[in-house]
């Protein structure tokens, strides 16, 4: 549409009625100034994943622009670091809905949650900022044949056609993709800076999953937010997290 534009690493539209902007690009000093974007340039500003609004990158945008209306959207307003996003909006919450309510109203797909005990002992592992130590998790997971068998058993039991597995590291994602491929389940690993034997670029992996070329994507922090793959019928949490934000988003 002629009324819609983008402001990101590739496009720099400014003369559109609606602009979809990348936070990483728009938040740079060369764009947040009176010459490029005056503070009152936008009448209406919508910020998705608003729980990030207290971080430096988002805060530069929030503090700079002076729109007539600012709307923040998030499914996970509570942060592990204790920072309060409600302060940014003067505690003005026009609408909120719980996960259960959203499912009951047909806004989200209902799901069955199954917890499977795999005998991994996490009690001695280090935790920093809601994340377990990556190397210690690698040692617990990679090469663990009993865990491989258990994951594969329940994957087969619930007869998934298209699945995503959340892994703790690049090595873990590669290892799981390799293990599933060896068992006859076409799989790919998706992570930043993909360079492994089973690695695929994010959009290409999604395309292959939708087309049935692969059946499982093993990912590391690439599908945590803003993802809608309607054909998915299984999500596998293959690593722990102390962060309720990460858990709910995934």
Spell out what each predicted region is.
Residues 243-250:
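Conserved SF2 helicase motif VI
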Residues 9-41, 55-60, 222:
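Conserved helix/coil segment N-terminal to the catalytic DExD/H
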Residues 3-15, 31-33, 174-175, 185-221:
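Conserved helicase ATPase core of P-loop NTP-dependent helicases/translocases
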Residues 1, 161-169, 190-191:
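Conserved RecA-like ASCE P-loop NTPase motor core of nucleic-acid helicases/translocases
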Residues 93-164:
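Conserved interdomain linker/interface between the two RecA-like ATPase lobes of SF2 helicase motors
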Residues 29-31, 106, 216-235:
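SF2 helicase motor core recognition
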Residues 44, 51-113:
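Post-DEXD/H (motif II) to motif III coupling segment of the RecA-like Helicase ATP-binding lobe
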Residues 19-22, 68-75, 216-219:
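Structural recognition of the conserved hydrophobic beta-strand(s) that form the central parallel beta-sheet
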């Amino acid at each position: 549409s002629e009324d819609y534009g983008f402001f990101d690493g590739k496009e720099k539209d400014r003369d559109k009625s609606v602009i979809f902007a990348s936070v990483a690009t728009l938040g740079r000093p060369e764009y947040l100034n009176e010459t490029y974007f005056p503070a009152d340039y936008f009448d209406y500003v919508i910020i998705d994943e608003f729980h990030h609004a207290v971080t430096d990158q988002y805060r530069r945008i929030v503090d700079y622009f002076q729109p007539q209306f600012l709307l923040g959207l998030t499914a996970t307003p509570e942060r592990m670091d204790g920072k309060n996003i409600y302060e940014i909006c003067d505690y003005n919450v026009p609408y909120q809905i719980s996960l259960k309510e959203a499912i009951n109203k047909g806004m989200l797909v209902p799901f069955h949650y199954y917890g499977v005990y795999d005998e991994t002992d996490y009690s001695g592992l280090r935790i920093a900022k809601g994340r377990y130590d990556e190397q210690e998790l690698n040692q617990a997971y990679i090469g663990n044949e009993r865990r491989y068998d258990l994951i594969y058993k329940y994957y087969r039991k619930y007869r998934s056609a298209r699945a995503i597995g959340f892994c703790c590291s690049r090595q873990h994602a590669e290892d799981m993709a390799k293990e599933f491929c060896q068992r006859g389940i076409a799989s790919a690993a998706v992570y930043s800076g993909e360079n492994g034997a089973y690695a695929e670029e994010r959009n290409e992996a999604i395309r292959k999953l939708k087309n049935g070329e692969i059946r499982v994507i093993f990912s590391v922090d690439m599908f945590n937010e803003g993802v809608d793959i309607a054909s998915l019928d299984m999500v596998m949490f293959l690593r722990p997290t102390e962060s309720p934000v990460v858990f709910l988003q995934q």
